[in-house]
Amino acid sequence: MLLREAMTDPLLERYGVIIIDEAHERTLATDVLFGLLKEVLTKRIDLKVVVMSATLEAEKFQNYFLEAPLMRVPGRLYPVEIFYTQNPERDYLEAAIRTAVQIHSCEPPGDVLIFLTGEEEIEDACMKVRREIGNMGDRVGPVKVVPLYASLPPQQQQRIFDDAPPPRDGSSGVPGRKVVISTNIAETSLTIDGIVYVIDPGFAKQKVYNPRIRVESLLVSPISRASAHQRAGRAGRTRPGKCFRLYTESSFKKDLQEQTYPEILRSNLGSVVLQLKKLGIDDLVHFDFMACFSHSIVQEIDFFLNSNTTLPLKWILLPKKLWPVHFWHFCGPYAKDPPAPETLMRALELLNYLGALDDDGNLTQIGTVMSDFPLDPQLAKMVCASPQFRCSNEIFTITSMLSVPNPFIRPRDQQGEADEAKSRFSHIDIPNFSRNSWVLVKKHCRFDELVLSCYISPWLLYLYKSPAARN
């Protein structure tokens, strides 16, 4: 949001203080925002920027912001006891389920938080935990298993804040326990009261862009030590807790990275480059990315570009403004965390192909319009071209659908029925279904039964229609 405001208000004059929280996550937007704010600070001495994080690389950020003062706020965490496995676990999902059952059987009262990588794993684990504990009968207290992942409807996400179930036999019975099984959104985005035990398999899904085949993938990857510390900290919010790491202590110390790999190093940069061009930043080499070159490296780039060095043929075929991107191949080892040169090259090529940039790397008229849409460049170009083919309403619906998660619901106990319902749709049916469903909403106020019979998420269907279409 702040990046988009900067397009119309480059000095961010509406704000006197800007706070950036969870800076250690190094999201794509955060790294770009750091560069913009550093530039704004040179022009607005009244602006204050506060960078907050629980696991921040303080020295790196201080150096970036020219020796900014550092304030440490003492934490209020209770002690957390860490347990490691003796040997690596072959199947971390089964190990997590086994550990949860052991905690419920043997440990004092307190809720459990399990970190897994995605929806399918989480739903599978929920079913197995319920079944395993249910088979134990009255020997243990009741359990409430709650999933948490991004595509879960909001009302179901709120269940993580429910209390643990009461004992079966009144106050004298064995107390119940809540088990929350979540993706890494529970690391920092929210705090769940009552969590005493954390189970950490050491993995998370990360979006990775392959510039050679121009495809983004969600890959299961080891977490960083910083993320592991964050996960363990979830157990010590209200009282002393325990964290069960399903990997060896040696793996924690030797195999895990210190910090999470910055998103700018593994993302498609098409939207970022388009935004920077709209902000008037034409020289991407000199843009002060949070993860960019030191001053000496920039001087070397200037010397190279202004010298008479013989250039490779493929450089000569490129517009001169694109040469710096290829130079990054030579100076990458000297940089801190530079954006991948091939990824930037692909972003510039894509924007040029879509007509957003001309052959000299300048923003075109259609590129200016595209930058106004908070969409991937391909989708923005599709929206801009739709009036020419008189299909704007349909393109708006399709674009909305491509900008939110998968609409299809596939309950584990009804997978066959869900697959059969999905097979009845053609490509054109979903936009028509979305549009016609809103007619039913206006007439009957509810359409839950209709969409659920087709195994489509009602709340995601709501997101597919633009506000204008819902009025």
Where are these predicted regions, by residue range?
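P-loop NTPase motor module signature
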Residues: 1-382, 389
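Acidic, serine/threonine- and proline-rich low-complexity intrinsically disordered segments
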Residues: 302, 307-314, 318-321, 327-329, ...
